[in-house]
Amino acid sequence: MGLMQISLFSVFFLLSLNVKAQNKSKENFNFPKDRKTNIAVLVYDGVEIVDTGGPMDVFIKANNWNGNYNIYTVSASADKNTLMDGGTFNMLSKYSINDAPQADILIIPGTSPEIVHKVSSDKKMMNWIVKQNEKTVMTMSVCTGGLILANTGLLDGRSATTHHWSLDELRSHPKIKVQETTRFVVDGKFLTGAGVTSGIDVALQAVEIIHGKEVADDLALGMVYDRYNTMEFLPKK
């Protein structure tokens, strides 16, 4: 075999290894192939509007890029009514935590710190999160939804983030590796967003994991969203 042939063989071999490395994370996310992927967004009184709508809109639009998503909200209230942030409007969910199907992707939006403490004391809702997480392919949080997720104990031993005003509270969980100045963190099947609009970043990252970077970038372009923005605007400590 000549030097040129050896060189080309080496290049193709290295490229094949690189492809496997890029696909390795995808192989860990076993989404259903015989039905739509269930995406459940948990809502409760006082839930933040952009936290809720941002990720939902990403997955709704991803259906135009060969996505196969069944997106729905799940209310913590038995009557399926949820009073959104600021008392601006009522959302009537398709399901409540009493009758919701098993989610493949579970999204937990955030709210004010006061309401975080209130909903975290709702044992039925917190147990529902834990039970759903047993079979989710991905579990995501947005903003202070990371605190709700942390209060279940599911983030223990994981890297995670939350809204920059609530990082100290996240640090009160000593088993969580708190990440600062980042818009989102991916650790295993857990994706945590920093705050409000970062829910869009988290959802786009999920799309990238599932469909590839090109699809996620095209989707962001269609949404007129810069998915490569930074946290440089935060006040320096």
Say what each PLM segment does.
Residues M1-K24:
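Bacterial Sec-dependent N-terminal signal peptides
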Residues A21-T139, L147-N151, D168, V178-E180, ...:
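Extended, subdomain-level signal for the structured scaffold at the beginning of enzyme domains
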Residues V43, T162, A194:
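Small/polar loops that bind or transfer phosphate-bearing groups
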Residues T139-M140, A160:
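A short beta-strand/loop micro-motif in the catalytic core of glycosyltransferases
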Residues L155-T182:
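A conserved active-site-flanking secondary-structure segment within enzyme catalytic domains
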Residues Q179-A194, V224-Y225:
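Conserved Rossmann-fold dehydrogenase catalytic segment
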Residues G195-G199:
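Short acidic alpha-helix initiation/capping motifs at coil-to-helix transition points
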